[in-house]
UniProtKB/Swiss-Prot annotation:
Function, in words: Catalyzes a salvage reaction resulting in the formation of AMP, that is energically less costly than de novo synthesis.
E.C. no: 2.4.2.7
Native organism taxonomy: Bacteria, Pseudomonadati, Pseudomonadota, Gammaproteobacteria, Thiotrichales
Protein's organism: Francisella philomiragia subsp. philomiragia (strain ATCC 25017 / CCUG 19701 / FSC 153 / O#319-036)
Record keyword Cell cycle present: no
Family: Belongs to the purine/pyrimidine phosphoribosyltransferase family.
Key words of the record: Cytoplasm, Glycosyltransferase, Purine salvage, Transferase
Protein name: Adenine phosphoribosyltransferase
Listed HAMAP family: Aden_phosphoribosyltr
Pfam family, one: Pribosyltran
Entry-linked InterPro entries: Ade_phspho_trans (IPR005764), PRibTrfase_dom (IPR000836), PRTase-like (IPR029057), UPRTase/APRTase (IPR050054)
């Protein structure tokens, strides 16, 4: 698939949210009537080319929900949300991770997956890899396995892929 359609709809916004940062804005991609569908299809093609065959999709709050549900629909799979703390009503596993300034946490229902599940993690952006690594750790707590991780965008200079060594990592667009 030609990824120019996707790349052309990601807008670089300099100095946001602070000076020196180039923010990659996906809202034009989502606003395009074909944007989400084309992105999900491109993700499905990438998985197929790598022989990755998940049994369920996990999307990380919040933009991972958007792309994760779309990909789950294309692949005919279920979707499990990975949430910020306090958003899930039943018993959860929780993993904390470091941010540039401070820390954050993610949660997942303890019964979100079966031990036989092969979970694909979906999110919009791979930067430092902290959020993705925490998501992997949550999945592993459920005894399921991680089939791979796929992102719309990867910021290569932040080395997030290195944090995820040992896992199948894909990104559609790299900067």
């Amino acid at each position: 698939m030609n990824l120019d359609f996707i790349k052309d709809r990601i807008v670089a916004v300099p100095d946001f949210p602070k000076p020196g940062i180039v923010f990659r804005d996906i809202t034009p991609l989502l606003a395009d009537p074909q944007g989400l569908k084309m992105t999900a299809k491109a993700m499905a093609e990438e998985l197929k080319s790598k022989g990755i065959k998940p049994t369920v999709i996990a999307g990380t709050e919040s933009r991972g929900f958007i792309f994760g549900v779309a990909l789950a629909e294309v692949l005919g799979l279920g979707f499990v949300p990975v949430r910020k703390p306090g958003k899930l009503p039943r018993e959860t596993y929780k993993v904390s991770y470091q941010l540039e300034y401070g820390s954050d946490s993610l949660e997942i229902h303890k019964d979100a997956f079966k031990p036989t599940d092969k979970v694909l993690v979906v999110d919009d952006l791979l930067a430092t890899g902290g959020t993705a690594k925490a998501t992997v750790q949550l999945i592993e707590k459920t005894q399921a396995s991680v089939a791979g991780l796929i992102f719309v965008i990867e910021l290569e200079d932040l080395n997030g892929r290195k944090v995820l060594e040992g896992h199948n990592v894909s990104a559609l667009v790299k900067y």
